[in-house]
Amino acid sequence: MSKKHKIKPAVAVNNRTADPYITLGAGRVESDAFWRWGDDNLFPNALALMARRSVTHRRIINDKADYISGKGFTCDEAQQPRLAAFLRHVNGDGESLRQVLNKLAFDKALFGNAFLEAVTDAGHTFLSLHHQDASRCRLARDSAHVLLHHDWTAFKAAEARTLPLYPAFEEQSDGTLRAVIHYKDYEPTFEHYGVPPY
């Protein structure tokens, strides 16, 4: 009878720095336009990659977002028909308030930050709420605006959208007034961004 030896694979990581988070891009990014989110400004990308590589980690993040958003929001439709209609469709994409809240809760659980864009007009005749992907948001150096960019590995100021932080609203080229609400928990020494809760 021969005995088979099972070989168990092992993974070793050589950490080049005292910081346990892996730097994905250049060692350090300097800019006078925005506050870096991590040394290479790609910390959200590293967190998203970590969640994609661990089924358990991702499941916990998804479950947390689902628990927070629950089954959605309800109200007495007979008493408040406009509120009920708003809860069903909070933006032009047809998303419900629950869907937007679920995305915000996911970002907050994964990144420690979430960004909600509020849209209205000068007469406040409507309100539209849009989730903004936290991995695409950075705080401007004036700490009063948020920069939205599609690819922070190749940032070009001309391609970035700039929106004010709530409660300030600024008129945009389409005539709407917009602001971004930045959700984060207080963390000592982290003035601009929140820290993931894990």
What are the roles of these predicted feature ranges?
Residues S2-T56, I60-Y198:
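Structured, contiguous alpha/beta core segments that scaffold functional sites
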